Amino acid sequence: MAVFPLSAKHRKYALRALAVSIILVSAAYIASTEGTERVRPQRVEQKLPPLSWGGSGVQTAYWVQEAVQPGDSLADVLARSGMARDEIARITEKYGGEADLRHLRADQSVHVLVGGDGSAREVQFFTDEDGERNLVALEKKGGIWRRSASDADMKVLPTLRSVVVKTSARGSLARAEVPVEIRESLSGIFAGRFSLDGLKEGDAVRLLYDSLYFHGQQVAAGDILAAEVVKGGTTHQAFYYRSDKEGGGGGNYYDEDGRVLQEKGGFNIEPLVYTRISSPFGYRMHPILHTWRLHTGIDYAAPQGTPVRASADGVITFKGRKGGYGNAVMIRHANGVETLYAHLSAFSQAQGNVRGGEVIGFVGSTGRSTGPHLHYEARINGQPVNPVSVALPTPELTQADKAAFAAQKQKADALLARLRGIPVTVSQSD
């Protein structure tokens, strides 16, 4: 369980103060450890009783974060977080029959906002459906729990992270609380140059990425805007850029000189000939349901029966019916990337090993779908990442794009410069 203090009135200023304080603490730590003998820490584990909020003595609101264990119900997680039984009963009695509150994904987090009086005020978590992750936000007003989410409540803030690798890059990033989707996206961005798992002790990672906040609580991560990896003394940089002509399709990653960063492991083929991108990867407010959703892939609008092609060489690992995805094909490629092609009307005869460009199925509207389209996903270690960063061709920058890219890159690089020379830092920039 993790507890995060929060001052709602001064949250914006608190974030700035947090950035400064952590930088100062990092600098103080470096100064204090020079010329002293390092003491080996001892790990002590002790099972503690469940947290009781009532006598905490905390006078301001704070967030409690609890991880979902296999087989947990929402009531189980809320009880473990310390919420009073009568509050849990009110929530389960009102919302216990709703599907998105019955099915929780193991290892996801449930966040509870606790007021200064020790009572629960809000509950937030994401459900995990095929192709979408939906924000469930419960808020207590006038003693009554209600579902709540709106554009006005959602804020996107750029986040800076700087990490020095100790034993492993993934472990060091996780300990610095870099979200798993950012860790896997980073792995894919530089896959053409090096493996993230190949970083050694003393190597460094500096990141600038978008974070999504709901009522002041970070609930999700967006795109990596810039990344800098120092590997064996050599610095590798990547900058996100989206031109106007790409519209809703998302951007791509280029090095500091505006060159295509990598060949993406042979992903040089679009999965189909399409008319438009009807829904890009990322978070959006559902226009009808008025809930925040992460769309875990890219939707391509195309006529029924349009051939769908493997986007790179690989091995078909699944072909059949897959829940809300309808008829789907999954292909495992090099560098740990897996692609998924959903809502197909029919399959081709392809099986086993396939070549990039080989037809694997045909556009349809099976599963949870409102019309013919292809839902295309890219995953690394099972984690959905933006396909444009790892599993779609990267266009060369035009002369007009190069000027715009240079200006955008200069701003991002100035933010990364704040992190150079600091071992570990966590900060916000707005």
Swiss-Prot record:
Monomer. The gene is mpg. Binds 1 zinc ion per subunit. The lineage of its organism: Bacteria, Pseudomonadati, Pseudomonadota, Betaproteobacteria, Neisseriales. Keywords: Cell outer membrane, Cell wall biogenesis/degradation, Fimbrium biogenesis, Hydrolase, Membrane, Metal-binding, Metalloprotease, Protease, Zinc, Zymogen. Its EC number is 3.4.17.-, 3.4.24.-. Has both endopeptidase and DD-carboxypeptidase activities. Degrades cell wall peptidoglycan (PG) to allow consummate expression of pili. Degrades N.gonorrhoeae and E.coli PG side chains in vitro. Required for proper piliation, which in turn is required for normal colony morphology, resistance to H(2)O(2) damage and defense against killing by human polymorphonuclear leukocytes (PMNs). Involved in type IV pilus biogenesis. Involved in resistance against non-oxidative killing by adherent CXCL8/IL8-primed human PMNs. This is DD-carboxypeptidase/endopeptidase Mpg. Its cofactor is Zn(2+). One of its GO terms (biological process) is cell wall organization. Induction: Expression is up-regulated in response to transient exposure to H(2)O(2). One of its GO terms (molecular function) is metal ion binding. It is found in: Cell outer membrane. It comes from the Bacteria. SUPFAM superfamilies: Duplicated hybrid motif (SSF51261). Peptidoglycan (PG) degradation activity is completely inhibited by zinc chelating EDTA and phenanthroline. Pfam families: NMB0315_dom_I, Peptidase_M23. Belongs to the peptidase M23B family. Zn(2+) binds at H295, D299, H375. Transmembrane segments: none annotated. Likely to be synthesized as a proenzyme. The cleavage of the N-terminal domain is probably required for the activation of the enzyme.
